[in-house]
Amino acid sequence: MEFPKALIKRPNYHFEYPHKRKDKRIGRGFSIGELEKAGLNINNARKLGIIVDIRRKSVHEENVEVLKKFLEQLSNQKS
């Protein structure tokens, strides 16, 4: 099973062309708010192998959905 990756917004730089810029990039890990919305805490997430970025404060709904799907897959495997 592949572990989920967090997506975050890329910073805007004035020297980049808009057509070369991507809207999202792969982040360092999931924020604490995203974990809480998905029903996890930091210790349980780290035991499951999910990387946690404690510095990030933003909560992206796409990441919450990815975490929920990952937890469903884990529960289906245990059954």
From Swiss-Prot:
MF terms from GO for this chain are: structural constituent of ribosome
InterPro entries, per database record: Ribosomal_eL13
Pfam families reported in the protein's UniProt record: Ribosomal_L13e
Q: Which GO terms describe its biological process?
A: translation
Q: Which keywords has UniProt assigned to this entry?
A: Ribonucleoprotein, Ribosomal protein
Q: Name one GO cellular component term.
A: ribosome
What's the protein called, per UniProt? Answer: Large ribosomal subunit protein eL13
Q: Ribosomal protein among the record's keywords?
A: yes
Classify the source by domain of life.
Archaea
Q: Which source organism does the UniProt entry give?
A: Saccharolobus islandicus (strain M.14.25 / Kamchatka #1) (Sulfolobus islandicus)
Q: Which family does it belong to?
A: Belongs to the eukaryotic ribosomal protein eL13 family.
